[in-house]
Amino acid sequence: KEIASKDQVELVDGANAFHRGGLLRLGAVLTTTSAPLRTSPVKRGDWVLRRVLGPAIPPPPADAGSIPADEKLFGGLTLREKLAAHQRNATCAGCHSRIDPLGFPLEKYDAIGRSRDQYPDGKPIDDSGVLASQKRLSGVEGLLDYLKSEEKQVVRTLAQKLLGYALGRTILLSDQPLIDRLADAGGNASFSKLAAEIVAS
């Protein structure tokens, strides 16, 4: 076909061959979760934690410091090494141990979402993350497998986000029974089913 159908969404064959497919590999998500001149496993991991898994984490302390926006200012260290040095600060380590392992699996996508195998200086990219439970996530596929294993929490977060959007307000305690019902649908909860349940509630 030369022109895409206007009546339906069609699955694109072979998206995985180009390291594409799904929300986490979407260029817009990868770009907005990057620093201006480099990737940010912290921003990407925070996005996955807050938007996909759902738990809230506190903002960083005022004295947390920051990592330069340009990799050229890392003094020969890799981004992972720079973040490891940052985590030595005990006040930072607690949250970063939850955030960073979810962001590192997306490192093989640059600051504007292009697939890559090495950093601009030629160093190979380690796209693994190790969770606090010592579970290792190997690349984006490992991250996706982990999210599938956390399906109930992912569905609950999606239900909360959809309901908040539909109502145009923050979720209240009185909304929890509906969220529980939506989350209990588990693997049967498609996006359209969640939306229909919210509309009918």
Task: Put a short name on every predicted segment.
Residues 1-164, 176-191, 196-201:
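Active-site substrate-binding loop specific to GH73 endo-beta-N-acetylglucosaminidase modules
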Residues 166-170:
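Core structural elements
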